[in-house]
Amino acid sequence: MSDLLATSSRQLEILDIFLRHGWDYMRQLLTFGRADRPEIPPPDILRRILTDLGPVYVKLGQLLSTRPDILPPNYIHALSALQSDVPAVPPNTIEQFIRQHLPQPPEEVFEQINYHAIAAGSIAQTHRAILKDGRAVAIKVQRPGIDATVAQDVALLKRIAELVSGTDFGKQYDVVALAEEFSQALQAELDFTLEASYTETLRSNLSQSRWFDPQQLVVPEIYRPLTTKKILAMEWLDGLPILAAPIEGKNYGGDVGAERQAVTRLIFRVFFQQYLVDGFFHADPHPGNLFYLTDSRIALLDCGMIGRLDAHTQSILVELLLAIVSLDSQR
């Protein structure tokens, strides 16, 4: 048995999940350090495997859902609906955690706070609170102990990437570099002060634009005095994930198609500005991070994973787009 499985019960747990779902390729790879040929399970099975594996792999699947250059459309569709099936941390535990990591006692800053999670994700869960001045805020709280889980799973993920790197698939997509890039981004997500800074930069960059109406886009305001590495406080926004939201065309004379087209155009231009103008972009734009608000605006959330493009790369992208638009393969 390879040393990949010799060090922790977590590694054995992962092997059990692969066996339960019949992914024989990964069983061979993890047990013997090699396998006959690369093999990816059907889309729905892969989604269930990633869900069962837990937070790190859910995040990986969500990221892969934005990479049609790596996976075919049926996999992109399946992974786009990927959510972590993780129960919320019990209220008593989360209250203790918040008291430990909040700069001040909750009763000094909140008129009220709901210790029952409004939403629970792979890395953190969100709570609603009311400040003493009456403003509603979202309190994003890191799951207790998640840093240790991430460290362990990231180490294993890198080892798996090394094993896969010898295959044609691994060489084509440089899976070792992809795993390292993903690992660094995920580790950065565990520091909410970084996410606060990234959110503020995106909010500033997107507050002015010649490409779209900034009034139609919201990046939440951060409340710095209440933000730490483990807790992120931001303005509360009422809405739903964009694929689950009831877009009814209420500002378009009831024309649902017209509003959907306008929303699509807005999101398209928002990201084009990030890529081609700012060179600073939200790097985890899966549908769960785009909200359709009750006032019909679009919100860009969870800005903990970002990317940067230098001027040279931006100019190459512009040339590529111009070549596509003009059907000029020689450009």
Give the ranges of each region predicted by the language model.
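ATP-dependent phospho-/nucleotidyl transfer catalytic cores
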Residues: P73, S80-P87, R99, A151-Q152, ...
